[in-house]
Amino acid sequence: MRHFYKLALMLVALAFIVSACGPAATQPPAAPAATQAPAQPAATEAPAATVAPAATAAPAAGGLQIPEIEQGKFNVAAVLIGPHDDGGWSQAHYEGLTYVEKNVPNVHIAYIENVPEGADSEQVFRSLSRKGFNLILGTSFGYMDPMATVAEEFPDITYIHLTGYKSNMKNFGNLMGAMEDMKYLAGMLAGSRAKKDGNPKLGYMATFPIPEELRLGNAFMLGAKKTCPECTMDVRWINTWHDPVAEKDAAASLMDAGAQVVLTGADTPAVADVAQAKGKWGITYDYVGSCKVERCLTTIYWNWGPIYSKIAAGVIAKTYKPGFDYFDADSGSLGLFGFMEGQTMTKGVSDLPAADIQMVKDTLAQMLAGKFTRLDVFAGPIKDNKGKEIVPAGSKFEQADLDQFPPGAPGLTCKYCMYWWADGITAELPKLGN
């Protein structure tokens, strides 16, 4: 659901926040006997610590060193927006990559971290392609258009873009998961915690004003209303995915303004550290191992390994067709810390009312069984924070409604769309335009 690139965002949100072909890529080796994705590990345990594979020195692209392939192997590279050990979004992808190496035969992996969106990323994707990588993963929203451009130049290489909304249905695919499922459940916990503490005020640290951030904030508020009808939520826009200082400042601002529980949409565990210092509660994001302090209520996390392995095995076997892949909780790739198999609830959750905890467990069970999806999170009746009916009773969202701002914006066609704040959110909508 993810990182920000100004040109791409202009196409989605009315200018909101605002090549030379290389030699042909080496062909992947013959498919191994087993083409099915490897068995998924327990989605509830933090992946074991891994050591970053060494990258062989090579000509730089935009000041970044490009790793080498290993001849005779299927070569997979990931381009990361932040450090591979950031304790959040990039680390979750990095550990998913190492899972591929361990579970799909004859695979070599590499990664490049701290790659800015824009021109530098296009150089990186082109350089990796010229090196001969067979599968290239781009893990930030703002890599979308650069990847699309490079994919046209190298038709024999498979490119997968995380988040975004584009695919050429040939060798450039789109992949994302319904984290709104887990944020909805986290909202239930946050509402219950705030109500029990006698302070029904929540906070949301939003990154960039894109549809993804509005839908996640709305999902969180809709969940909170299930356990705390009187709860309200303030919002701070931080305009970054990874900046521990900015994240701490925003968390402190929300907590000082009265928020009892604060959810982050950014990459680091900073919100929990601030909560620990202020005696409030923080909800971290992206990485299973990010909920380390006592005042971390839970974390909503990704488990990319099985999904990446399935894609890699499919590309090797020539059975994978890039397109639009948007997975729900039943994929096993989304988690709510403290509630998955083998996990223990945090101290901040364990003393909540039994009925609230059971509601979370029951809804999660439905999600894991495929009986409750991201579209059910946004089932009517839903009103916005001005009292306007957004979704009538008996209706629910479609995928385009999750991904698009108001009707008429360039890009997807939507009916209800995602340019509204749910009832209980006290912030104003970000303005469209320059």
Which residues are covered by each model-predicted region?
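Bacterial N-terminal signal peptides that target proteins for export
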Residues: M1-A8
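A residue-level marker of the well-folded mature domains of exported/periplasmic proteins
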Residues: Q36-N434
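Extracellular/mature segments of secreted proteins
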Residues: P29-A30, M233
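C-terminal motif of bacterial Sec signal peptides marking the signal peptidase cleavage site
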Residues: A15-A20
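Bacterial signal peptide processing site
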Residues: G22-A25
